[in-house]
Amino acid sequence: MPISCKSRCGNRAALKRPKTGDALCKECFFAAFEAEIHHTISSSNLFRRGEKVAVAASGGKDSTVLAHVLKLLNERHDYGLDLVLLSIDEGITGYRDDSLETVKQNRDDYQMPLKILSYEELYGWTMDRIVAQIGRSNNCTFCGVFRRQALDRGAKLLGVDSIATGHNADDIAETVLMNILRGDTARLRRCTDIKTGGGEDSIPRVKPLKYSYEKEIVMYAHYKKLVYFSTECVFAPNAYRGHARAFLKDLEKVRPSVIMDIIYSGEQLRFKDTVKKPVRGICTRCGFVSSQQPCKACVLLEGLNRGLPKLGIGKKSKGDRMIAKQNQELALRERANLVKNDF
Amino acid sequence: MCSIGEDDFGDEGGTHAMVAGSVPSGIDLSPGECSKCDISSDELFQLNFRTPECRDCFLAYVRHKFRAALGAAKVLPRDAEVLLVVDGSAESLVLLDMLYYAQTQNTFKRLHCSARMVYLEDQPVQGRDPADLESLEALSKRYEAFEFYVITLGLPVGSLKLLKDYSPVAQESNELIQKLSQLRSLTSRQDYLQQQRKNLIASVAQKLHCSHVFNSSISVDLATQLLTSIALGRGGSAALDVALLDDRLAAGIKLLRPLKDLTEQEVQFYVHAQRLQPLLMASSRYGQELGDAASLQNLTSAFVANLQKNFSSTVSTVFRTGGKISESTHPEQAKCNHCQSALDVELSDTLLAIEYSRSVSEAGVRLNEAIEDPEIISKRRMKLNDELCHACSSIEADFKNGS
């Protein structure tokens, strides 16, 4: 017997919502999914009328759905937002070049301006060249650190009031688990925040999809026939996150509500007064947000430019020793040159 | 899609990676000279991160961990009455043996408290053979100084008996078993049973006039417990689930976990050094036989066991994370009727989001015609169960569906 839609709209149910277990028809699912995101945005006061918001767009399912839904809600509920797409080109052949084509498609479909910033122009390095230098291990460190800052740089360039990212509920639950697995209390504190940053000198980041299940995002994109790019990065996947992810997926199979429960748990965690809090400051070299001096991006870049790509990987003291050693060698060579010139 | 986020990078730099490495398990003792007291012995105890030592030096070290846990926090008042929960597992025997030793010391070093022990017979609930009375009696004989009580899980506290007066009665059913059978999921059953165990222990302690209860959880148990609590939505009270002192028991009784800093290897070595004999039936938890994927708890223990095998240092990181968190409460906050944890349901956006999802799913396309704002409906629903915490209301919801 066909199951009818839970909302009693008279249609047959087309899907079972992973989040609530309710059987819904397509139209009712769209309505519910969009209403939830609208509720998240309005109840958490993510945006204010007249603001310019950059949607961090990678071409993947999350950012595509985010761009689509934000545009739709902006018109439906008259948020009065000026939406722009912001993409980062890491310079990964066979991955980012293709996904950027998808973003360009989104730009045309949603009539939203698009700004693409590349690692090449910001740092003088593409990921392809970085990987050629450092190899397949630790390359994700460069990509991640640079991307975070690149988004800030892009946002500053575009003069936006906030950056909306496509982090979904699964991502957040996974991050809670991951931070517990490695005892990172600083990140555990803030990883469930729907809005981060936003002090005097930083641009806030918001996660309108915080309560949207990944499975529902995929369903939404599928039924709405949205164009998105779904290929894994050609470089190494992140084993650590993978571990937490696999665990979360197993948990979700047993009890789908576990994703929201973990987010709730993460929010309820309090820390002893003796636990150190990170201090957010500004990097003295580049002027972007950082909790250390100089910021990670500057250290990594210095390493690349000095020909010491491992500089920012591992302990700082190790990096300092590497610099000292290189300086010593350079000085020696300089002295040798002087001697030669005397003749 | 690249899933690397800013959270993947530590302040030390580099992606955090779980360092693969395993702890050798099993007991492999070789003869040699103790690196501490220079006396040669047949069996040297080589713990990870420690130099090989003789039996006496090893015992002094592990027993100190137990005393230090109690002493540093000053949680046990002088001459306290303590109830020791013995389940026959290696850990519980280690705790029993350590406590016994601490009491037989000379005046200067003696731990001043008087202790009783209780064995919770869970045979009817677990559906397995009753406890092996002979082993229990052997245990009682070895530690004669402690009174040994037995009670069956699910029976009223009035049925508490001294071991010598106890005879196992084959039980088909009791109230607890019936309750458990009404719960749909094993996750809820295990969670419910854990709360009921705690309640029963508290009643026994109260009956025996004990102000403190000793529980034998060790670090890996607490790492598992922390992740389980997080997965169940008990984040707010997770700190108490893994702390040395848990004061959520009825009548102000305090639950202590003095072995919380012990590792599995230390327990193994201690069992060997003292020739303890763990009871076989203690090896399985309720519902464990249904497989790893049967409940959140089973999955989490399997996950931690796997970590322990392949990334053993991660387990201690998880355990230490548990030591950094504290309970989210202030004194005047109401407590959950079921688990006594602080209630903070009303303030949570996440819980509102869950209810909101249900409301809008019901409304569907007719959302705009709805007479009442789904947010108001959601808030009203959240208030329906305002005497239970989020996790306990999940158990409650499971009941209704099952009956």
Swiss-Prot record, chain A:
Disulfide bonds: none
Pathway entry: tRNA modification; 5-methoxycarbonylmethyl-2-thiouridine-tRNA biosynthesis
Any GO BP: tRNA wobble uridine modification
Alphabetical keyword list: Cytoplasm, RNA-binding, Transferase, tRNA processing, tRNA-binding
Main enzyme class: transferase
Molecular function terms from GO: nucleotidyltransferase activity; tRNA binding
Annotated localization: Cytoplasm
PROSITE patterns xrefs: UPF0021
Its job: Plays a central role in 2-thiolation of mcm(5)S(2)U at tRNA wobble positions of tRNA(Lys), tRNA(Glu) and tRNA(Gln). Directly binds tRNAs and probably acts by catalyzing adenylation of tRNAs, an intermediate required for 2-thiolation. It is unclear whether it acts as a sulfurtransferase that transfers sulfur from thiocarboxylated URM1 onto the uridine of tRNAs at wobble position.
Family, as annotated: Belongs to the TtcA family. CTU1/NCS6/ATPBD3 subfamily.
Name this polypeptide is given: Cytoplasmic tRNA 2-thiolation protein 1
Lineage of the organism: Eukaryota, Metazoa, Ecdysozoa, Arthropoda, Hexapoda
Swiss-Prot record, chain B:
Pathway as given in its UniProt record: tRNA modification; 5-methoxycarbonylmethyl-2-thiouridine-tRNA biosynthesis
Localization: Cytoplasm
GO annotation, cellular component aspect: cytosol
A Gene Ontology molecular function term of the record: sulfurtransferase activity
Domain of life: Eukaryota
Pfam families: CTU2 (PF10288)
Gene Ontology terms describing biological process: protein urmylation; tRNA thio-modification; tRNA wobble position uridine thiolation; tRNA wobble uridine modification
Entries under Gene3D superfamilies matching the protein: HUPs (3.40.50.620)
Keywords attached to this entry: Cytoplasm, tRNA processing
Similarity section: Belongs to the CTU2/NCS2 family.
Main function: Plays a central role in 2-thiolation of mcm(5)S(2)U at tRNA wobble positions of tRNA(Lys), tRNA(Glu) and tRNA(Gln). May act by forming a heterodimer with NCS6/CTU1 that ligates sulfur from thiocarboxylated URM1 onto the uridine of tRNAs at wobble position.
PANTHER family for the chain: CYTOPLASMIC TRNA 2-THIOLATION PROTEIN 2 (PTHR20882:SF14)
Protein name (database record): Cytoplasmic tRNA 2-thiolation protein 2
Record lineage: Eukaryota, Metazoa, Ecdysozoa, Arthropoda, Hexapoda
